[in-house]
């Protein structure tokens, strides 16, 4: 067991970065405990794991570079992913001298020259890595009957080699020169502009790796997350220090469950229990709210200022607010929306009249109790209890079963809506359910956060909900919402993880109607992905529900290719349904078809 003597200094680092209003603050847990699976880290990083945050997370240098006119970078993320050529202190000292010499009004060219001298291009901290356990012909290919789909499976399996990344040794030796968070093992990254690991993306990436028999790579990625929890007390949104104030949907325990199911390595889960418990407690202690006498959780962030990776965009939307306090609250809502993974969506809009109308100025993420987060936490508690049962820890089994039961009761009494026939997010401002479709309304089905004895009743109400909202009418998959706002997590965009939650959730109901719809939607998703790949040779981050075989759009950046979670979901469904799906079989979708 590795002692973390300097972890309390992390709290000091955090306290220097947190400057939210009283309405938005919450305390951090005690991070002074010993943990299994902790790894030694570079001494300098241990002293101040966020040493580079003075460059990449906040301050006048960040603000000046990111708001330069004309702008220096098309994408705000470019700058905060660059490597420092000097120490943070030296860089700040010389920046301040330059600002003084330019009377605090440097030109865009002055700033460009400064960046060119003091920073190196993004990605220099990483090198391409071919996973050592990659197999040319993994066994899932034998489960695919259609020859075209089988060849596609071969090509998808090869993409893992394209997405492999390994951090250079200098990152762990000099972490203060980088925004990237050092981890001990290589990773599979999402792709495109996302050249580092991301938390919830990794769940579906790891599932795909396991089906590809890449057990060592999958285990290494999970162990990276263990090391991060054991150093920082939680898993940031992604592998950069500028994500320090927020996490993403808590799926680490689910990753461990997936690994154990494939390998039967119960010891791996048992040894990880302290870490998994700590992450669970981080969420329930720091994201909790009380609604109708139930303790449930919301998405929220603990940092101040705009998102560094979208700095210019946040400053621009913040200009709509009249005071610094109002701007800060808006930045908090933006980052809470990012923690949800759905950045951004009308799901998080609360208009003055209590609807989901508006734009980003209406973001109220921290005032919405989300179905998915609470369902995931229920699942975490159940899995932790299961792992303790394997270890023979009967007291801990009872403790976490009790936690799960309390969460389930809250989900049932606050979030289940009898009239809608599904679960609905809850608006704490207007004290009412939010009756707007989003796939997460069905997320309890995926993690079995419902009474199995009521499966028939729930199935009937869910199928009626699908019919009422015409969710089966989209040729390119089921969209994330039915609102066309231009945000990337609204219509017409459709995302692999949300299709997965819908399909696997319906299958878990185990009724003929639900299972048939599950297979129909899985087939449709495989085919629209195949059509897009056949045409463009890309797996996309998101797709267009209104058009068969077309990538998505909208949001703050161009649609990205790669793409980790899209690959993972397709590989899993080719493994599960490859004998049932053929290019010529029906799915309610046709090449070139558009929704009317």
Swiss-Prot record:
Which sites carry carbohydrate? 288, 293, 359, 451, 516
Q: Which InterPro entries match?
A: 6-hairpin_glycosidase_sf (IPR008928), 6hp_glycosidase-like_sf (IPR012341), Glyco_hydro_37 (IPR001661), Glyco_hydro_37_CS (IPR018232)
What is the official name of this protein in its record? Trehalase
Instruction: Extract the GO molecular function terms from the UniProt entry.
Output: alpha,alpha-trehalase activity
Indicate whether Glycoprotein appears among the record's keywords.
yes
User: Which organism's genome codes for this protein?
Assistant: Drosophila melanogaster (Fruit fly)
Please list the tissues where expression of this protein has been recorded.
Answer: In the adult brain predominantly expressed in glial cells (at protein level).
Q: What class of enzyme is it?
A: hydrolase
């Amino acid at each position: 067991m590795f002692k973390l003597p300097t972890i309390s200094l992390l709290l000091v680092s955090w306290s220097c970065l947190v400057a939210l209003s009283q309405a938005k603050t919450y305390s951090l847990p005690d991070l002074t405990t010993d943990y299994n699976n902790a790894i030694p880290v570079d001494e300098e990083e241990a002293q101040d794991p966020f040493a580079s945050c003075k460059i990449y997370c906040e301050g006048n240098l960040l603000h000046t570079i990111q708001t330069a006119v004309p702008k220096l970078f098309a994408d705000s993320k470019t700058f905060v992913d660059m490597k420092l050529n000097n120490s943070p202190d030296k860089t700040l000292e010389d920046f301040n001298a330059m600002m003084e010499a330019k009377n605090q009004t440097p030109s865009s060219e002055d700033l460009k020259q400064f960046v060119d001298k003091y920073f190196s291009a993004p990605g220099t901290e990483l090198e391409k890595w071919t996973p050592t356990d990659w197999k040319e012909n993994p066994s899932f290919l034998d489960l695919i009957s259609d020859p075209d789909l089988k060849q596609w499976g071969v090509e998808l399996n090869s993409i893992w080699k394209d997405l492999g990344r390994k951090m250079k040794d200098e990152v762990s030796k000099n972490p203060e020169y980088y925004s990237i968070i050092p981890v001990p093992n290589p990773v599979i990254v999402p792709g495109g502009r996302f050249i580092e690991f991301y938390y919830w993306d990794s769940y579906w990436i790891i599932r795909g790796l396991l089906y590809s028999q890449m057990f060592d790579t999958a285990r290494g990625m999970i162990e990276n997350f263990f090391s991060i929890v054991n150093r920082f007390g939680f898993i940031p949104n992604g592998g950069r220090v500028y994500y320090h104030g927020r996490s993403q949907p808590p799926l680490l325990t689910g990753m461990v469950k997936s690994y154990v199911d494939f390998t039967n390595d119960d010891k791996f889960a048992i040894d990880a229990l302290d870490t998994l418990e700590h992450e669970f407690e981080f969420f329930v202690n720091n994201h909790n709210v009380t609604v109708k006498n139930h303790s449930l959780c919301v998405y929220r962030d603990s940092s101040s200022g705009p998102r560094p990776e979208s700095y210019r965009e946040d400053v621009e939307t913040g200009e709509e607010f009249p005071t610094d306090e109002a701007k800060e609250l808006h930045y908090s809502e933006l980052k809470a929306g990012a923690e949800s993974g759905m950045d951004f969506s009308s799901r998080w809009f609360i208009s003055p009249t209590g609807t989901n109308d508006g734009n980003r100025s209406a973001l109220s993420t921290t005032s919405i109790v989300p179905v998915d987060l609470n369902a995931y936490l229920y699942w975490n508690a159940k899995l932790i209890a299961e792992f303790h049962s394997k270890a023979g820890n009967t007291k801990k089994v009872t403790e976490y079963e009790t936690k799960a039961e309390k969460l389930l009761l809250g989900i049932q009494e606050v979030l289940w809506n009898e009239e809608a026939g599904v679960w609905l997010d809850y608006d704490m401002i207007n004290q009412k359910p939010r009756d707007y479709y989003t796939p997460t309304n069905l997320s309890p089905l995926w993690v079995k956060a419902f009474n199995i004895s009521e499966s028939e009743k729930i199935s009937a109400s869910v199928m009626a909900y699908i019919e009422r909202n015409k969710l089966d009418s989209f040729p390119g998959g089921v969209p994330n919402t039915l609102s066309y706002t231009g945000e990337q997590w609204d219509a017409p965009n459709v995302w692999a993880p949300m299709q997965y939650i819908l399909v696997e959730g319906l299958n878990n109901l185990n009724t003929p109607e639900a299972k048939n719809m599950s297979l129909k939607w899985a087939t449709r998703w495989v085919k629209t992905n195949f059509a897009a790949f056949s045409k463009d040779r890309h797996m996309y981050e998101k797709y267009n529900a209104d058009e068969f075989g077309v990538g998505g759009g909208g949001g703050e950046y161009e649609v990205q290719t790669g793409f980790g979670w899209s690959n993972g979901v397709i590989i899993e469904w080719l493994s599960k349904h490859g004998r049932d799906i053929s290019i010529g079989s029906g799915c309610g979708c046709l090449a070139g078809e558009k929704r009317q």
